[in-house]
Amino acid sequence: METSRLIQIIEMGAARNLMDYVQAFQLWAPKSAAAAMPCAGGLAAYTGPDSPLTTVKGAGPDLQESEIEAAELFFRRNHARQVVFECAPWLTDDSVERLKRRGYTVAGTEVVVAAKLPCGVEAPGHTPIELMQDDWARVFQAAFELPAEAICPLLAQVAWRLPGSVKLGVADADGSVMGCAQMAPAGEIAVLGNDGTLPEARGKGVQTALIRERLRLAMKAGFRWAVAEVAERSQSEKNYLRCGFERVYVRTSWIHA
């Protein structure tokens, strides 16, 4: 498959996954005043002023001035603190110039990795288990070392409620959960995310076991692709590549405060 076609599939999946989050916020956290609108072929989402999911995902390669203006108006009306476009590398030179001219700057990047299914999967080094909601919330917050305030507990709650998702963990010999991870459907894509390992359990193969188990579940469910977003040169990237994923592209975040 051509890389451009795969990027399109993944970006469509990212927008769909973001919409699932918005709907979960609307249903389970109505005070967040979550909202969404189509934007440049993707989705603009508001899920709270401090939420990392207040962003645009899935935008196409050609961002028109009118589409950027519409997104800015959407976020302004919803009292967002900034406007964020998370864009694939197919963004045209003209689109980049439009963003720069309006004051956008690059705030960060993430690597998108993918595995075509079916694929070979080694047996997990640990036995993954499905997590109960209390364990999920506790490990989610501790693994990501998030403060117990503002958006953090809400993100854990909403992620748990994501439709069709599977929430997994790995426990030690005493039954204490050492890490968490999630798989969520987005069309033909299984989105692998929310990978977190408690600080004291890192380096023990927890994430690798959870990646392998989600690959197994994704194949059983008939997905064509498994996709994840990781920080460049991170241990997570190494673990995913070790499990058979390949780097597909780097997504760039353009921000205007």
Question: Where are each of the predicted segments found?
Answer:
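A conserved beta-strand-loop-helix scaffold within acyl/acetyltransferase catalytic domains
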Residues: A148-E200, Y249
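Conserved N-terminal entry element of GNAT/NAT acetyltransferase domains
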Residues: M1, A36-A40, K116-M132
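Conserved beta-hairpin
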Residues: A35-A40, D94-T105, S165-A181
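N-terminal charged segments
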Residues: M1-R76, A150, W160
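Conserved acetyl-CoA-binding loop-helix of GNAT-fold acetyltransferases
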Residues: Q64-L73, N194-P199, G203-K220, R242
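Conserved active-site alpha-helix within GNAT-family acetyltransferase domains
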Residues: T92-V106, K204, T208, K220, ...
